[in-house]
Regions:
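A domain-start/cap signature at the N-terminus of enzymes
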Residues: 17-68, 80-86, 94, 131-137, ...
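The feature captures the conserved acid-bearing segment of alpha/beta-hydrolase catalytic domains
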Residues: 181-265
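Alpha/beta-hydrolase
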Residues: 70-72, 186, 274
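Cap/lid segment of the alpha/beta-hydrolase catalytic domain
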Residues: 103-133
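The conserved beta1-alpha1 loop
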Residues: 70-74, 209-210
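Hydrophobic beta-strand anchors of alpha/beta hydrolase catalytic cores
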Residues: 69-71, 99, 205, 271
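Alpha/beta-hydrolase active-site loop
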Residues: 123-150, 171
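Active-site glycine-rich loops that stabilize anionic/oxyanionic intermediates
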Residues: 73-77, 277
Length: 314
């Protein structure tokens, strides 16, 4: 009799664990005839028409919970340009994740995301009161929209982006740790006042920054940055309750990475320096100063994806 009671009890525990795991997979796991490849999706958010570019990899299966990476463009750019510049679609096919590029709304004639810079910011003046938008909530709305159409592993949702998109990723880390498991800012630092950034959970990160970046400064506040990238590395480590000193975790030609490994909830905070790198996506030569500054010796997009996919939201 005791054995039977014990078996029933264990069965309830197992069923409960399976139910908990199932809750993290989206309703889109039941969707029929999913559209693969590239599409543009329009949604309404805060009474405005918004859109995002969606890429579903060739190997997508509707019964397999799939990670999602949201990849934000920089100021003056757009969703399609960011997809091409980062070459994330091809990485999605290799690594098996859904790739989304949100489209920013215009402010003063240029598409931009509200990463937190305001008229009061010391390094830049952006008056979002002229065109208000909550882009953190927009990102969360995108996650929910995708999750109704595709089979998402909702524990494996991530944010990356270039410049303003990198700053947006930091804001997401501050305000949406309940949705996003990790972030990968490129050439951007936190725009919010540090005291207003209070993540509810540890948020692992990998960040890339060039030492010759004149838009988002490497060593000190300047350009569009309220602080230098090196200072941001230390700040994010503190926000994630990291202990000790960073150690070198990658050394390549003109590219090196340091990591804090003893952080809350097993998070890793990683910072990659591109020697004489400009305001560029790592590994993508691009145009202008990026022909000289970007390192073609690494595939930054693959490094980002490999890092992000290690982590699940707790």
């Amino acid at each position: 009799m005791m054995k039977r009671v014990l078996l029933i009890f264990v069965s309830f525990i197992i069923l409960g664990l399976e139910a908990d795991n199932h809750e993290e997979n989206s309703s889109g796991c039941d969707a029929l005839n999913p559209v693969l490849g590239k599409t543009t999706v329009s949604i309404e958010h805060e009474g405005k028409n918004r859109s995002y570019r969606l890429y579903v990899p060739k190997n997508y299966k509707s019964d397999v919970p799939t990670p999602l990476i949201i990849n934000f463009h920089g100021t003056g750019s757009n969703a399609e340009q960011q997809a091409i510049y980062s070459d994330m679609d091809s990485v999605a096919d290799k690594k098996g994740f859904i790739h989304v590029n949100p489209q920013g709304l215009e402010l003063d004639g240029r598409p931009v995301f509200n990463a937190g810079l305001t008229m009061q910011s010391p390094a830049n003046k952006r008056d979002f009161s002229k065109a208000p938008r909550d882009d953190v909530d927009f990102a969360k709305t995108i996650v929910e929209d995708v999750s109704t159409k595709y089979c998402l592993n909702k524990k494996k949702v991530y944010s990356t982006g270039m410049s303003n998109g990198g700053r947006m990723s930091y804001r997401i880390g501050c305000e949406a740790a309940d949705t996003f498991a990790a972030i990968a800012p490129v050439a951007g630092v936190l725009s919010l006042p540090p005291e207003k950034c209070q993540p509810t959970k540890a948020v692992p990160s990998i960040a890339f920054h060039g030492t010759w970046d004149l838009v988002s400064s490497y060593k000190k506040a300047g350009g569009f940055s309220t602080m230098g990238a090196v200072q941001m590395f230390s700040l994010w480590a503190k926000k994630n309750q990291c202990k000790g000193k960073p150690i070198v975790t990658f050394q390549g030609d003109k590219v090196s990475c340091e990591s804090y490994l003893s952080c809350a909830e097993g998070a890793e905070i990683k910072f990659c320096t591109i020697d004489r790198g400009g305001h560029c996506w790592p590994g993508r030569l691009g145009f202008g100063s990026c022909r000289l500054g970007a390192s073609s010796n690494i595939n930054g997009s693959e490094m980002i994806v490999d890092f992000l996919l290690q982590f699940e939201r707790s």
